[in-house]
Amino acid sequence: MVLDPSRYQDHRTWKMTPGLIRARQPFFKKNMIGLAILAGVSAGIYTYTYSFLHKDNDFADVPIPPIDEKELEKLKKEYEQHKQERQ
């Protein structure tokens, strides 16, 4: 059977027996330190990558052309119409 009962688990509740808990105690602190290091390295890499990617500003030197007042009003009307259609 796939889930054969282990002698280190209670057969009714599947909880660890006191013997298994005692056997795992010496490794708990080292495992938590390893987990903290692994999580710290992962968070550091993620933070570095996120901050590096947000520094990118490729289009800073491209000038934005001025917009005509009539065209601006037309765009505002289109935006309002689109906003009302979504609701």
From Swiss-Prot:
| UniProt-listed GO biological process terms | mitochondrial cytochrome c oxidase assembly
Keyword hit for Isomerase: no
* Cellular component, GO, one term: mitochondrial inner membrane
Family, similarity comment: Belongs to the COA3 family.
Q: Which Pfam families does the entry link to?
A: Coa3_cc (PF09813)
Please tell me whether the keyword Mitochondrion is annotated for this protein.
yes
Q: Which PANTHER family match?
A: CYTOCHROME C OXIDASE ASSEMBLY FACTOR 3 HOMOLOG, MITOCHONDRIAL, CYTOCHROME C OXIDASE ASSEMBLY FACTOR 3, MITOCHONDRIAL
Task: Name the gene for this chain.
Answer: COA3
List the ranges whose topology is Mitochondrial intermembrane: 54-87
| Self-association state and partner proteins as the record states | Component of 250-400 kDa complexes called cytochrome oxidase assembly intermediates or COA complexes.
Q: Give the record's membrane topology.
A: Single-pass membrane protein
* Record key words, sorted: Membrane, Mitochondrion, Mitochondrion inner membrane, Transmembrane, Transmembrane helix
So where does this one cross the membrane?
A: 31-53
UniProt function note: Required for assembly of cytochrome c oxidase (complex IV).
Mitochondrial matrix topological domain: 1-30
Q: Where in the cell is it found?
A: Mitochondrion inner membrane
From which organism does this entry originate? Zygosaccharomyces rouxii (strain ATCC 2623 / CBS 732 / NBRC 1130 / NCYC 568 / NRRL Y-229)
The identity of this protein, by name, is Cytochrome c oxidase assembly factor 3, mitochondrial
